[in-house]
Every structure is written in C-alpha cells, then in structure tokens.
Design a protein with these regions (language model features):
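Amphipathic/hydrophobic helical signal segments and adjacent flexible N-terminal regions
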Residues: 1-56
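Edge beta-strand at a domain terminus
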Residues: 33, 38-43, 134-176
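Short amphipathic alpha-helical surface micro-motifs
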Residues: 40-45, 67-70, 90-92, 100-102, ...
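Mid-length scaffold segments of soluble, non-membrane domains
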Residues: 53-118
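An anionic, turn-rich surface loop/hairpin at beta-sheet edges
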Residues: 71-84, 119-145
Length: 176
C-alpha cells in the first residue's frame, strides 16, 4: 500500500502543513463572534495542541461535527451538530466512513507520526450512494489529522475544508 505522501494532492499537502494556522484562525474568528464559552466547554477537542498519541482502533463510533469559523460573511462562525454514526474498519488500510448525515466523509487513514495519523478522503453529499475516488475532484477531497485527545476519545481535524467553515473537527468516541 502506498504511503499518504505518495497519494496526497498538492492542495491537501498544503492544508495538512498549515493545519495549525487554520485551527487558530478559526478559533479567533469564532471567539470574536461571541462563541468563547462554547469553545471552552469542548476542552481538548478544540485545543490545537491536545494530541497525546495513539492510533485510532477499528470499530463503530459516535461522530460529532463542529464547524469553526466561517468561509464568508453570512455563514455561522460556530456550529455543533448532534452525533452521527461512523465506522473505522480494516481492509488493505484503515477505512473511515461517516455513515449518516448530509455531508459524509469517506476515506483512508494512514500512519503519520507518533502523535497522529493522516486522513485522505472525499465528501459524499445528500442522497449520493458512491464516493468519488480521492484526487479526482478537488471540490470533494478532504484531508486531515486523526489524533487521540483522551481516554477513548479521538478527533479528526480537517483544516480549510472546501465549504462553509475554516475548520471542521469531528469528535470520535467509540460506541458502547
């Protein structure tokens, strides 16, 4: 199986490289729009340097999406969605699938370093049943870091997503 460095698009390589800038800029914008209390209540989930290392195991997860910062005027600077169902399963590589919702990320999780893994995937919209292959439609490509941030708690940090927000964070908690 190829490494993530062999698969990633040049645009997503920049997103991954500049993740921290996107994270802090999104937080600044949301705080300026009076969302400090909501941000603080999330604890490690919305702290840029909260990664503590440890790969995410396969299984079913509750996935809660938080969109931080607005790409353009008129959009909300902070939105939290209720938990959706997600699954991580092993094939030739670890595969992440958001199983429900109107915007569903689907893709592969690659080893990266001691603190995190890389997610490269695509966005499935609405009632679509098939995902585009990563790298074929830049408007659908998604890239991010998967990080453990606590006991049985991970996050997927998606810097500079194509639509709506400056940063998407998906909280991943194993289903009991």
């Amino acid at each position: 199986m190829p490494t993530w460095q062999e698969v990633v698009t040049s645009e997503d390589r920049v997103r991954l490289r500049d993740w921290r800038t996107a994270f802090t800029r999104a937080l600044e914008q949301s705080r300026a729009a009076n969302h400090s209390a909501e941000i603080e209540s999330e604890g490690a989930l919305l702290e840029p340097d909260a990664a503590i290392g440890g790969p995410i195991p396969n299984g079913d997860y509750r996935c809660r999406v938080i969109k931080v910062g607005a790409k353009s005027q008129g959009l909300l600077e902070y939105v939290t969605y209720p938990a959706f169902r997600c699954r991580i399963e092993q094939g030739q590589a670890q595969r992440f699938t958001k199983l429900s919702g109107s915007q569903r990320q689907v893709g592969l999780i690659y080893p990266a370093d001691q603190l995190r893994q890389v997610f490269l995937g695509t966005l499935v919209l609405g009632d679509e049943t098939q995902a585009y292959k990563y790298g074929t439609d830049g408007d659908r490509d998604v890239a991010g870091w998967v990080e453990r941030i606590g006991d049985n708690r991970w996050r997927m940090v998606l810097p500079s997503p194509r639509y709506e927000s400056l940063l998407d964070v998906i909280e991943l908690v194993p289903e009991q």
